Regions:
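Expand to "…catalyze enediolate/carbanion chemistry for C-C bond making/breaking, isomerization
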Residues: 25-350
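Single conserved hydrophobic/aromatic residue that forms the stacking wall/gate
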Residues: 1-23
């Protein structure tokens, strides 16, 4: 049911107006009156490499800060034993407040415990109340439905308002169960309106949820003809791109096998992912290298944009470059490459 806002716009928030417009558009799409709607990217963050750091090991915080990782999440979930959950929470709050993550070119996040645990509530309340003004995102594990995202978003709304926080914390989710994968499109669509910025492929728990036979977390099974994770990765990627959400590939368990890590990262990059987890510092530079566009690719992308700009001035929608036809679709791909390169350059300049 579409809820139309009052005819008078006085006192009506822009958010309410935007929701109404989206409801109308989706109503028209569902009934075949419109072919598509474009969701612009919700937020750009450089996320080529994503370093996981146990909250129970504060000695690793300073090393993570000085690393070349684009993104660091301090973990309260799988990497922390039950008896260490409470002290790990305290460690993480101190690390967020005392260390200059953004100043060192990092997006800083916290992976909380899942909503089916008794830890989750205190994770959110204590971390956000005490360090929310310096926290970029919260990573929610085992998201199964869009309601999971709504619950976390509602908690953040209340805490930020009660504490007067000016920083709006983003939400990222791990798709790591068959339920989450079955609902991935709905999670992306509805979650976007509830702070959702990114989805991560949690291959280890996803494998367990599928009862898949695996050898290495994120690795290939020699008995399977091809990449057994391709279907899940592709399904999640499409949901992300449909609704302007960032898509991040998950972990590769054997940090003593850099070649296989690179192969996995290249497969993700080829599909359209923006980055990959690093569960060990040795994997950071591998991810950065794979997800950094080569100079030749950046140069070619800029040439495409210049050629199409010149064609547009002449009233043409397409152009030729090096004997090949390029058009609006070429421009979109080129813009993605140039935007990523600009973000990397900006980070390096500090």
């Amino acid at each position: 049911m579409i809820r139309r806002p009052p005819r008078s716009t006085q006192g009506v928030s822009s958010a309410a107006s935007d929701v109404y417009k989206r409801q109308v558009l989706e109503y028209l799409i569902q009934r075949g009156f419109m072919s598509h709607i474009i969701y612009e990217p919700v937020k750009q963050r450089l996320q080529r490499s994503e370093l996981a750091v146990p909250g129970s090991n504060p000695k690793m915080f300073e090393k993570a800060l000085k690393s070349s990782a684009d993104y660091v999440f301090l973990d309260l979930e799988d990497a922390v034993a039950p008896d260490d959950k409470v002290p790990a929470r305290k460690n993480i709050i101190e690390a967020i407040n005392d260390l200059d993550w953004n100043g060192n070119g990092k997006t800083i996040s916290v992976r909380i415990n899942s909503i089916d645990t008794h830890y989750m509530y205190r994770d959110v309340v204590e971390v956000v109340e005490q360090a929310g003004d310096k926290l970029d995102t919260i990573l929610l594990p085992k998201a199964g439905t869009a309601s999971d995202v709504y619950m976390l978003s509602a908690m953040l709304n209340q805490i930020e308002t009660s504490k007067g926080l000016k920083n709006r914390i983003g939400i990222e989710v791990l798709i790591e169960t068959t339920l989450g994968m079955a609902n991935v499109m709905d999670i992306a669509q509805k979650g976007r309106e509830e702070r959702l910025e990114a989805m991560h492929f949690g291959v280890a728990d996803y494998a367990a949820s599928c009862r898949a036979r695996t050898t290495v977390i994120g690795g290939l099974n020699p008995d399977y003809p091809g990449d057994q994770w391709h279907a899940g990765l592709s399904q999640m990627l499409v949901a992300c791109r449909a609704y302007g959400i960032r898509a991040i590939d998950g972990p590769f368990g054997d940090f003593n096998d850099p070649e296989s890590y690179i192969d996995a990262a290249k497969r993700g990059a080829a599909l359209g992912f923006e980055g990959k987890w690093a569960i060990h510092p040795s994997q950071i530079d591998l991810a950065n290298e794979v997800y950094t566009p080569p100079e030749s690719e950046v140069s070619h992308a800029k040439q495409i944009l210049i050629a199409l700009d010149e064609a547009a001035k002449e009233g043409r929608g397409a152009a030729q470059l090096n004997g090949r036809m390029i058009d609006a679709a070429s421009a979109k791909m080129a813009e993605n490459i140039v935007n990523t390169d600009n973000a990397i350059t900006s980070k390096l300049k500090g």
